[in-house]
């Protein structure tokens, strides 16, 4: 299908929806459905109209230049034509992006899990820094950051930690954070001043509801036990901690942060739903990847995606070859927008190239 035909179909669809909304013959259910579809199309139509108007303006200005006898008016038209032609590629890009199919999970909240990798205590401290970085980023975006679990160490590091982040566009922004994050710095305990390299793994899962994943109660093994602290000592006298095993997949979720067994089970189930939904999603994506590749990086969670080098004050995202010398702003203040916006733009560019949308 040519772009012109596709464009005309979208415009006609928008006009039909507008006529239906103004017709006054819809029941409440139909009105809600059509209103939603109309709202989804509206920003696309606005971009298309700006693009079409620019083309009309180019034709008009070219005509003025070809026929106008007044040199001053002709000069003004030439300047305006130059500006419009320079702006046209940006309008084209906006239209192409608006026409790309939206990813089904982009509107969802996200569960973020950070785990210390290689590097012992230093890796655990780095994992804690990353987790706190995402907390600050969420604060900047006015998102809700709800702690789900933390397994900490005696020196203040995190073996692993997870949180539910809720708000507008959470998963769309955070989905590219999944992967191995590496840090290069001199540990406080290092007497010889040698730079150590350690790592942490970040996993970002779209929040899943019961409607997204079907779980049979008979497929769950639920164990309860006493919660323990960083040193392994028991911190609760009742069996408030919960371990849930999904037998068919072998996925295990443990939760002990709450004093209430009921609350721990609820949090564990929330994480379990997200992990099972993610398993299904990964399987589907692997099947799609056999025919096409439109994702920034490999999508493999064992892929090293970013390095934080403290001696150089440098943060490098290896998937898009982006280097920023703002390590303190990024980690201490959660200023991730520049990295994330570049990742989103790169992903959109790959999708556009794959979609073969032609003007």
Swiss-Prot record:
- Where N5-methylglutamine occurs, the residues are 233
Q: Which Gene Ontology molecular-function terms are recorded?
A: translation release factor activity, codon specific
Q: From which domain of life does this come?
A: Bacteria
List the subcellular locations. Answer: Cytoplasm
Record's GO cellular component terms: cytoplasm
**What keywords tag this UniProt record?**
Cytoplasm, Methylation, Protein biosynthesis
InterPro entries with a match to the protein in the record: PCRF (IPR005139), Pep_chain_release_fac_I (IPR000352), Pep_chain_release_fac_I_sf (IPR045853), Prokaryotic/Mito_RF (IPR050057), RF-1 (IPR004373)
Alphabetized SUPFAM superfamilies for the sequence: Release factor (SSF75620)
PROSITE patterns under this entry? RF_PROK_I
Fill in the PTM field for this protein. Methylated by PrmC. Methylation increases the termination efficiency of RF1.
For this chain, the family text in UniProt reads: Belongs to the prokaryotic/mitochondrial release factor family.
Question: What is the role of this chain?
Answer: Peptide chain release factor 1 directs the termination of translation in response to the peptide chain termination codons UAG and UAA.
Q: What is this protein called?
A: Peptide chain release factor 1
The protein's organism comes out as Orientia tsutsugamushi (strain Ikeda) (Rickettsia tsutsugamushi)
């Amino acid at each position: 299908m040519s772009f012109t035909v596709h464009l005309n179909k979208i415009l006609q669809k928008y006009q039909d929806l507008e006529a239906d909304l103004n017709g006054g013959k819809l029941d409440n259910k139909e009105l809600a459905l059509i209103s939603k579809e109309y709202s989804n199309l509206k920003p696309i139509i606005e971009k298309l109209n700006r693009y079409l108007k620019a083309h009309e303006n180019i034709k008009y200005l070219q005509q003025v230049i070809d026929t106008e006898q007044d040199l001053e008016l002709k000069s003004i038209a030439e300047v305006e034509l130059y500006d419009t032609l320079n702006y046209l590629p940006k309008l084209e890009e906006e239209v192409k992006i608006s026409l790309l199919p939206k990813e089904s999970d982009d509107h969802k909240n996200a569960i973020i899990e950070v785990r210390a990798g290689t590097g012992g205590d230093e890796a655990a401290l780095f994992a804690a820094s990353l987790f706190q970085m995402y907390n600050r980023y969420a604060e900047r975006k006015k998102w809700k950051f709800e702690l789900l679990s933390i397994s900490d160490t005696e020196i203040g590091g995190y073996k692993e930690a997870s949180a539910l982040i809720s708000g507008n566009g959470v998963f769309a922004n955070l989905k590219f954070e999944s992967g191995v994050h590496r840090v290069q710095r001199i540990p406080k305990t290092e007497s010889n001043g040698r730079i150590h390299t350690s790592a942490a793994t970040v996993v970002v899962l779209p929040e899943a509801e019961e409607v997204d994943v079907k779980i049979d109660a008979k497929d769950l093994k639920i164990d309860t036990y006493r919660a323990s602290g960083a040193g392994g000592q028991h911190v609760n006298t009742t069996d408030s901690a919960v371990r849930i095993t999904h037998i068919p997949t072998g996925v295990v979720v443990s939760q002990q942060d709450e004093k209430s067994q009921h609350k721990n089970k609820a949090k564990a189930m929330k994480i379990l739903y997200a992990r099972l939904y993610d398993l299904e999603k990964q399987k589907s994506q692997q099947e799609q990847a056999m025919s096409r590749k439109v994702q920034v990086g490999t999508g493999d969670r064992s892929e090293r995606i970013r390095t934080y080098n403290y001696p150089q004050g440098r943060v490098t995202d290896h998937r898009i070859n982006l280097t920023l010398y703002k390590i303190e702003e990024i980690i201490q203040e959660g200023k991730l927008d520049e990295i994330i916006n570049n990742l989103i733009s790169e992903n959109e560019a790959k999708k556009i190239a794959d979609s073969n949308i032609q003007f």
